[in-house]
Amino acid sequence: IMIDAGTVNSPVLLQVGTPHAKKSDPSNPTTLHDVFFRIGGPHVGRATVSLEVNSDNVLLDHIWAWRADHGVDGSFGWEVNTADTGVIVNGDNVTATGLFVEHYQKYNTIWNGENGTTILFQNELPYDPPNQTAYQHDGVLGWAAYKVADSVSHHELWGGGSYVVFNVNPT
């Protein structure tokens, strides 16, 4: 399934579970397979978060969250297809197999849940920050591709990779 952001900013494109509820049955977990998120590319798109997982015991299999770095002229750019974060996981015991998150303007992935596991994480940081001032926070230059909350005591990431090429302002 393809979830395509529209021109009006969406706070969240797909939300699994109610925030802070975390209700789920470990013997019958929620699963998402082959879900693709697109912000920009063929047309202007805007969203604050692409995927937010609030339930426990969720399986994410082949998720691709993409803020466009190319496409139809006028459909992408730092101020055009805005998107803070690709994936936020708040649930416990969430497993992701094949998590691809690319070009978001803040943390690409934030993992707040306990006992999370990701097997294969692929990431490209945004190519298009206009300058360093636009791409920093709290005295930190840039944003992490995969941020595990300081409060999390157990998390595993197997086969993670991230790379970046700043092509607008390489300073």
What residues fall within each predicted segment?
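Extracellular/periplasmic carbohydrate-active domains that bind, remodel
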Residues: 1-171
